[in-house]
């Protein structure tokens, strides 16, 4: 429902600087609500947009793995289309990764989620620190940027149920955070 809005807002943000070329790899993870038709419309309108249509819902991390097989840029940005992160925040991740990091997560200073959602996020943070070796000072999120080198290493992992952050932590320890604004989820 928001994919067209997010893509066009992101294009607007990138066009303000003229510093970067961008491409979009949009994955429809088995949705039957017309999402892939919207992706095809965007791909017809913009030559730098391509779509991947998964046959069924394989889950967010499998969808991300599928997208990583198609990207070609120096940097790869992961972002949900639920509008919790405004495209105006992308430049913060780009600037931070250019300091020499392999991976940068957007860190939401104040989240606009329910108490239950915030609690489950906290539990995930503690679990990933204990089980996967995530550095204590790093806070993960669904808004991240990685280098091409990291993307190439990540797609070497062949797993039916990948946990993308866990793979990131195995591939690199050169990880940064940058604070970004968090908005109330529009959909999903």
Role assignments for model-derived ranges:
Residues 14-20, 43-48:
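Short helix-capping segments at alpha-helix termini
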Residues 5, 9, 34, 38-41, ...:
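Alpha-helical transmission elements in cytosolic ATPase-linked domains
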